[in-house]
Amino acid sequence: MEKDKKYILRYALLDYIATLIAWQLFNIYRFYEVRSTVYFNTLGDFLINTKAILMGIGMPLFWLIVYFYSGYYAKPRQKNHTSDLLSTLFSTLTGSLIIFFAVIINDYPEQYTLYYRVFAGLFLIHFFCTWFVRFLQTSRLLNLHAEGKVGINVLIIGSGKVAGKLSRQMQQTKNSSAYLLKGFIRVNSEEKAVAEQDILGDTEQLKEIIKEQRIEALILATDRQDSDYTEGLLKQLYVYHLDILSVIHKQDLLFSNITLYSLPGVPLKYLSPTQLKPWEQNLKRSTDILVSVLGLLVLSPLFVFLALRIRLESAGPILYRQERLGKEMKPFTILKFRTMFAHSEPEGPLLSSLNDERITPFGRFLRKYRLDELPQLWNVLKGEMSLVGPRPERRFYVERIVDQAPQYYLVYRVKPGITSLGMVKYGYADSVEKMIERLEYDLIY
């Protein structure tokens, strides 16, 4: 989000400055600690030699990459000192090990024990420099949270006793919470236990309220706790593509697979989680880029052959372009090798079937081995898709699916993929019913 970009840049800039200073301090320490093996007469000569200057430029960039892959820059407005400490400890240890074996081990100290002291110096200097600037920035951020100037705007769905208790807990911990409570949403005939002026409306007005208040998360806190009632509410909330959390009820403690999120002193459960952690998402994206680039290069001769074969078999374009819905339901143009005769949908969208007469003979071969999907490597490289994820669908079919299965909105919290477990299980779906059956597997992502 736009609000996050500002704080991501701020944290990244401070990290850059901290690592730049830390590397120079480490070089000073390194010069005196391993002086007998450093071929410079003075510290000044050591710090301004060409290699040291290049390393001074490259090291901060290296550290930013390490911090990025650690997931530190995800959700920058939800930082706290504990998470900062743990994340900084883990990432600086990882980065220090890489630098030690790539750079420091070439120093060849006279005493083997110097290796340990140099590594300890590298780790401790980088850790304290980085953690110090992060501590200052996060302290400032927490002060802004307490003043209500920065945070995640949330609504509580409910206005009864449970909602009232939750709001009091949030008020008591507002100094350390990233969530800014904007108000309550009345649900049916629930007995009111909060101030009337804090109730912004009911579920029928929720769309307008979310837009006006710039809401980023919803917390379900109704007095009724039965699963059918909760499921009915969730079906109304999924459409907004926001984080959805809920207070924890006694029956939730019977299940070990719920995803927890804790406000300070207020445990909540996530009802719309993504399965991958931030660092896993970063690693997945890097894998997508690497594999898609290699795939496009290595398979280019095959692409040429398939393109010629398609062109010779029937009139029409080689590539089939169609609008699909991607992450957060943003439309994009998907690419495929054409497997049908041109103009095969004169009367509107129509799903294909196993013996569909619109499919060309060579198109059947392409579909059998999924070769028609290969051009989507370009979609993956552009960031519109991933190698693995729920299959993207046309808006026409999405609207019909969500009418019967509103939880389908959850798949749009992640990027669609070239392949998925549902695709392996069901193949090409030839009806909305099969698409809904495939949803069971798509929700895994």
Regions of interest found by a model, annotated:
Residues 280-344, 379:
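A hydrophobic, helix-centered structural microdomain
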Residues 1-149:
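Signature of alpha-helical transmembrane segments in polytopic membrane proteins
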Residues 50-51, 88-92, 96, 286-297, ...:
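Loop-to-transmembrane-helix entry motif
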Residues 88-92, 147-165, 317-340:
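Membrane-cytosol interface motif
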Residues 382, 396, 405-445:
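C-terminal terminal-structure detector
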Residues 85-89, 120, 283-290, 439:
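Hydrophobic alpha-helical elements at and bordering transmembrane segments
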Residues 352-415:
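A short, structured surface patch at a secondary-structure boundary
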Residues 1-18, 22, 30, 78-80, ...:
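N-terminal hydrophobic signal-anchor/signal peptide
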